[in-house]
Swiss-Prot record:
<dbReference type="GO" id="GO:0006412">
    <property type="term" value="P:translation"/>
</dbReference>
<keyword id="KW-0694">RNA-binding</keyword>
<comment type="function">
    <text>Binds directly to 23S ribosomal RNA and is necessary for the in vitro assembly process of the 50S ribosomal subunit. It is not involved in the protein synthesizing functions of that subunit.</text>
</comment>
<comment type="similarity">
    <text>Belongs to the bacterial ribosomal protein bL20 family.</text>
</comment>
<dbReference type="GO" id="GO:1990904">
    <property type="term" value="C:ribonucleoprotein complex"/>
</dbReference>
<dbReference type="GO" id="GO:0003735">
    <property type="term" value="F:structural constituent of ribosome"/>
</dbReference>
<dbReference type="GO" id="GO:0005840">
    <property type="term" value="C:ribosome"/>
</dbReference>
<keyword id="KW-0689">Ribosomal protein</keyword>
<dbReference type="Pfam" id="PF00453">
    <property type="entry name" value="Ribosomal_L20"/>
</dbReference>
<dbReference type="InterPro" id="IPR005813">
    <property type="entry name" value="Ribosomal_bL20"/>
</dbReference>
<dbReference type="InterPro" id="IPR049946">
    <property type="entry name" value="RIBOSOMAL_L20_CS"/>
</dbReference>
<dbReference type="GO" id="GO:0000027">
    <property type="term" value="P:ribosomal large subunit assembly"/>
</dbReference>
<protein>
    <recommendedName>
        <fullName>Large ribosomal subunit protein bL20</fullName>
    </recommendedName>
</protein>
<dbReference type="GO" id="GO:0019843">
    <property type="term" value="F:rRNA binding"/>
</dbReference>
<keyword id="KW-0687">Ribonucleoprotein</keyword>
<dbReference type="InterPro" id="IPR035566">
    <property type="entry name" value="Ribosomal_protein_bL20_C"/>
</dbReference>
<keyword id="KW-0699">rRNA-binding</keyword>
Amino acid sequence: MARVKTGVVRRRKHKKVLKLARGFYSGRRKHFRKAKEQLERSLVYAYRDRRRKKTDFRRLWIVRINAACRLNDLSYSRFINGLKKAGIELDRKILADLAMNDVAAFAKIAEAAKKAL
């Protein structure tokens, strides 16, 4: 039986890894072993940060809502409690957008939350 060398398979594998490593710095882009190691690490970071992004955005929205609440003489926790008691079901993303872009509408919502307390 003839001996089969891995030439075609190896070249295809190396091309695939080096293509994904485009944009990496120095040898991490050009050398297969370094590129492969960096690519594995990069994919781990990407996986982790896709999940972390949701937490980061929620924290950002809470900071923005809290800042707008303070302008309306409310704390964030009392504001959220007031919204629940008033039966207003707006999520934090929408509330943060209103706080940034439509201050008057947010002030009305804050007043409704104050009355419900």
